[in-house]
Regions:
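Transmembrane beta-barrel strands of outer-membrane/channel proteins
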Residues: 1, 64-70, 118-122, 169-173, ...
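Internal hydrophobic scaffold segments of catalytic domains
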Residues: 1-6, 163-169
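Signature of Gram-negative outer-membrane beta-barrel scaffolds
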Residues: 1-111, 126, 131-133, 238
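Residues that define the transmembrane beta-barrel architecture of outer-membrane proteins
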Residues: 43-47, 96-100, 150-154, 161-163, ...
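Residues on the lipid-exposed face of transmembrane beta-strands in outer-membrane beta-barrel proteins
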Residues: 49-55, 68, 104-108, 156-160, ...
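Repeated loop/turn-to-beta-strand initiation elements of outer-membrane beta-barrel proteins
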Residues: 59-62, 113-116, 164-167, 219-222
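Surface-exposed extracellular loop regions of Gram-negative outer-membrane beta-barrel proteins
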Residues: 72-83, 94, 108-154, 166-167, ...
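Gram-negative outer-membrane beta-barrel transporters
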Residues: 173-175, 193-239
Length: 239
């Protein structure tokens, strides 16, 4: 096996630098356990400071939390790819992100058998490292205009205990804004494997989940679960 991009050979010829996955070692013959095609590291460092507080009075149980998170990311390529000879080997440089979030919830325990829980949260977080590069297997280029993603979420659940039966129903609604997503496909026009990166992706996820547990004995129980949900894009993305 020769370490070249077979998709590009027909258009550029087997001796072109363009088809080489590792220009510094052209037409290298691959043996068992060799690294070929691509070789890179994604270095991600995170630091997180988190605080949570709980308070109870009567039937009310309150909880609140907040966090601050710092993230750095870097791609370090170990091969000089023929499709990006100047931008594939070595360090990409470092991208830095500062984010955080908060959550708030309340549980109302009416009695030993009935509990209602409400919660909401917001998170501002760094994008996924793999999606932050234009073509992570080949290039060190960051996606232009990278920014933090924003996640809003809310949920409500009701728990019921009746004898040996415990039932819980949960509804959730999540808004995801400013996401970065990536798809890969073969591009016939350019005769090569291509990455399509989309920024400013906005989505919404919502649904209902239910579970029932019937405790026959202390060692035997039956469980039933069901869920219905939907996930959809809410507007046009940038690509």
């Amino acid at each position: 096996y020769t370490d070249i991009d077979k998709f590009s050979v027909g258009d550029f010829g087997p001796n072109s630098d363009y088809v080489q996955n590792d220009v510094d070692n052209p037409n290298r013959q691959i043996k068992e356990d060799d690294v070929f095609g691509y070789d890179y590291d994604l270095n991600v460092n995170k630091a997180n400071l988190f605080y949570q507080h709980q308070f109870s009075k009567g039937i009310f149980h309150l909880f609140a939390g907040a966090n601050i998170e710092g993230t750095t990311m870097e791609r370090y390529g170990h091969m000089r790819n023929g499709r990006a000879m100047e931008f594939s080997k070595g360090s990409s440089g470092t991208a830095k992100f500062l984010g955080g979030g908060a959550k708030l919830g309340i549980a109302l325990t009416f009695n030993a058998n009935n509990t209602l829980t409400l919660g909401a949260g917001y998170e501002n977080r760094a994008p996924i490292a793999y999606n932050s590069f234009i073509a992570p297997r080949m290039r060190n280029d960051f996606v232009q205009g990278l920014e933090n993603e924003n996640i809003f979420s809310a949920e409500a659940s009701y728990r019921l205990n009746v004898g040996p039966v415990t039932a819980k129903v949960t509804g959730y609604y999540t808004i995801l804004n400013d996401l970065v997503e990536q798809n890969a496909f073969y591009n016939d026009l350019q005769s090569q494997f291509t990455y399509l990166t989309m920024t400013g992706v906005n989505k919404v996820h919502y649904g209902v989940e239910a579970a029932v547990v019937y405790n026959v004995t202390s060692a035997l129980s039956f469980n039933a679960v069901a869920s219905v949900g939907n996930a959809e894009y809410t507007d046009n993305v940038k690509g």
